[in-house]
Amino acid sequence: MANFSKPANMMTMIFSFFALLQFTAALGHGNHHHARRNADAAIQEQVEEVAHHLNKRAIGPFVAISGVCSTGTVWWGDCDSNGRQSYPRLEIRQLRQNGDQWNLYLLGMERFMNKDKGDRLGYYQIAGIHGRPFVSWNGFPTPLVNQAGFCPHGQTLFGSWHRPYLAIFEQAWYLAVTEVINDFPENQRQRWRNAASTLRMPYWDWAQDPGAGQPTVPTLIRDQQVSVTKPQGQVTIANPLYSYSWGNSLPNEMGGGPWNNNPFTLRRPVANPTRSNNNEMNGRFDAMRISLRDRVFALFSSKQSWGYATTAQIGVRTDLSGSGVDSFESVHDAIHNTAGGDSGGHMYFLDVSSFDPIFWLHHTNVDRLMNMYQYIVPDSWVANGNINRPMAQWNEGEAKNGGTPLKPFTKSTYGDYFSSGDVRESRVFGYYYPETSDRSYSQVAQAVTRLYGGGSRTLNKRDEPVNEKTGQYLGRPLEEGDYHHVLDITADKYAMDGSYTVHCFIGNGGNTTHSNSTAPYGNSTTPASSAYSSTPTPPASPYKNGTGEVLEDYDPSKDFTQSPDYVGAYGILGGMKAGGGNASYPVITRGSLPLTTCLQGKQYYGELKSLKPEDVEPYLQKNMYYKVIGVNGELDPSTIPNFHVAVRCTKVKPATSEYELPDLSAPYELLPKATENKPAGKPFTYTPSPIDIPLPDASYGENGNGGHYDNNNGGNGGNGGNGGNGGNGGNNGGNGKPGTSYPNTGVFPYPTLPWQEQGYCASVQTIKYVYPDGKAAGY
C-alpha cells in the first residue's frame, strides 16, 4: 500500500505557507491603510488648524498678519525662521501641473474676489491698500496723513513693504481656499485638503525662457474662461486671473478710473466694445523678454547692497551711493507699463494697478527675485532714505530706515506694526521659493545662471541663435575682455498723467512718422484720449475661441517691437494724475536697459567689430534709436521734464565657476558721443534735491546714542558727532534738528527722525501672535 503521509504533510506546509503570505499581505495592506488614514488625519488637522488660527487672527480691531501658517509646539509660532510648515511658492506654469492645487487656487481666487466690499479680508479692500480709493485699512487712524495710497514706490522701503502686503493677500486668499474645501461633500474633502496642505500662491516669471513655441504670458492668465471642478462637477467660470470686476459700476470712493470709469480691469484696452487686448500684451512681452532676462542677470551680478538694488530712488541708490545703474523696482515698472499698455489699462496707473489679478503674480515674482538677491548679498538690507512724496501714512520729508513701521501691516491683534527687520526672512510668513530652499549663495547663483544667463540655452548646430518669434539675437555667455553696455535712463516718475515708456532699438529701420522721435519706426500706439471717452458699441469682429480676444485687435506685422533691432522697453510708472500727490520736488528715478545682447548680435553678424567702448560708441551714435510713448501717444524726449539718457559701460569679470556670478559692478564709464546728438542725450550731471539726500548713518540711531547730525549743533548730549568740524556731540544741539549742512529750503520742516515715529523698532523681532484674550499663539 502506498504511503501518502509525506505528500500530505507537504500539502499542509504549502497551504500554511500561502496562508502566511495572505496574512502578511493583509497585514501590510492594513498597515498601509492605517498609515494612509494617519497621514490623512494629520493633513486634515494641519489644514483645519491653519484655518482656525487665521480666522482668530482676523478678530479684533487689527488683523495679525501671518501669511499661510498655523501654530505648533513652539510658542512663537511654527512659521518661524526655521521654516516649520513653510512651503514653496511655485511658478504659475509649474503649479498648473498639479491639477488639484490649480483648481483650488482658482476657486480660492474666485471666492476671494467675490467677497463683500466691506470685508477687510476681501479682494477689494486688500487691493485698495496699495493706492485708490485712498481710505484707511486695518484700523489705521483716520483721517489719513495724506489723501494717497500706502505703497512706497520710488522709496527705500519698496521691497520690504510689499512683503507683508503679499502675505496678507496670501492669507486672505488661503482663508477663501479653506471655505471652498468645506463646500465639497465630506467624502471628497480629504482630496482637497491634501492639495491645500502645501499650496501657496504662485508667481509669474516674465523673464524666464518659456520654451520653444510657448508664449511669454501664459494663456492661463489670458483666457477669459476656465474649466474647474466644483461640488456639482466640472463647470466653466470666468477666469479670475483675467480680470477683476467692481460690479455694475465703479464705486464712487475710487475717485474715477481708466476708460470712462470702466467697472472691470483692462490690459492694453481697445474700444467698441471696451475690452482687453491680451494678444498684444503677449506680443510685447515676447519682444522684451530677452531684455528682462538681461536686466535680472545684470542686477544679480551688480554686487550692490540689497537696499540699493531694490529701489529706483535716485539719491539713495546711484549718484550718491556710487552703486550700479539699475534696480529691481525699475524692472518692475516695465512690467506694469507693458501689461497695462499706453492705451491706459489699469496696470499702467500706479494707484489702480493692484486691482488687476496680474499685479499679484507679478509682485510675487518681484518678491522672489529680491528674496533670491538676499542670498547674494546676505549682509545688507534696507537702505536709509527720505519719503519723497505725500503718502497715506507718512509726510513728505520724513527719514526712514529698517526699523520704520511698515504701516498699515500689523503682526498682532493689538496693532503692533511689522518693521523691515521682522520680514527679512520670508519663512515667517510660511513660504520660500524653489531657488531659496537651501538658503545658499551657490543655489541662487546656479539658478540665476540657468534661468537668466545669456546664451545658456542649448542650440543645435543648425539653429540660428535668435528668438524664433522676433528674430532677436539670444546672446552668448560673457567672456574675459567683454564689456557690458547699458542705456542709462534718468526720469521724473510723476512728470505727466499716467506712465510713459522708453523703447530702444539698435539698427536701421524705415522712415519715422514723428519728427522729434529718434526711432525710425512708425507710431502704432492709440492716443489715450480714447481711454477716457470710450463709448461701448457692439463688437466689430468675431471673438477667438476660448479667450474672448478679438482676432483683429493685434497684428504683429504692425507692432514696432516685433523687430530684430528691438532692445526692450524701460517703464516709468506713474499715477493717474501728474505730480505724485503734490510732491514738493520731482520724484527722480534711475535705471537702465542692457544693450549687450543686441550688440553681441551685431558682432555675430559682422556689423560691429567688437564690444570695446572705442567700437561701440561710434556704432551707437549712428545706429541706436529710441522713442518715448505715453498715454497720449508718442512724446518728444527733449520736452519731458528731467528726462535724460546716456550710454555707459563696465568691463566684465567673468564667473570663475558654475557656483559664481560674473562681476558687473560699478563704476560705469560714460560714452558721451553715443547720445549727445539725440534728444535728451546731452551729458547730464544729477543735482540732488534736498529730499534726495539721506541723513548721515549716525542720524538714524536713537537720541543719546551718539551725535545725530553732521556738526556739533546736532544731537542732544551725544558722544560723538561724525562730520562738520568734528564736534563731540554737544549739549546745545536741538532735539531732532539737523546740522546746518543738511539741505533745507524751507519747503518742509526739519525731518522727523526714524526712531521718533510711533511703532519704530530697530531690532530683529521674534514674531509672536497675540490674540484678543491675551494668550500668545501656541499656548
Model-derived regions, located:
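N-terminal secretory signal peptides that target proteins for export/translocation
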Residues: 1-5
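Long, low-complexity Q/N-rich tracts
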Residues: 712-734
